[in-house]
Amino acid sequence: VGRDYNAEAQIFDHHQRPNPLRDDEQPYSSFGLIWAQYGRAYLTAMNVPTENIEAIHDNFDSKFVLPIDLLDNGAMEPSVAGPLSILTLSALLGSLKPVFDSTSETDDDDAFMAALPIARSFIEASIGNFAAKARAQSLVLEAIEKAGASPILELPMGMPYRSALDQAGADHILFVVTPRGDDWTI
């Protein structure tokens, strides 16, 4: 892409010197630059509620995009994953690249098109999980308010609740109960 980064021209290369940096001085990869430019619009297109877009954007950026940026820029070594390093998303997608002695003129494009739906499924699943956690947070905070001073928190279904308890400072909650079929779980 010409070793240039120009969001207005939709050029998102990160190989120029100095390379584009985040506010905290960590380097962007092309994926990070694209996410920074279009991530919020992507979340809107995925029907993430407006009030959750910033939090989910930042969460996805720090937990999904940043590690890819760091690996792509050599700021983090894949070996930090130990024997699982060949199973990182970057390594798995990289395994779809053409082999060194391939002579097909379309191999790079074919590999990209093979990787695209795989990457998309992980991106959308991750965002979906962050959005579900935000919905759970809201439900748990409502249940905490409804419970008042009771040491028992009743939730309408199983869901993540620990971060909402911490956020609300609900140290008085000793038990969390949720329905499971005709029974309850504690």
Residue ranges and their predicted role:
Residues 63-149, 159-161:
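RNase H-like (RuvC/DEDD) metal-dependent nuclease/polynucleotide-processing core
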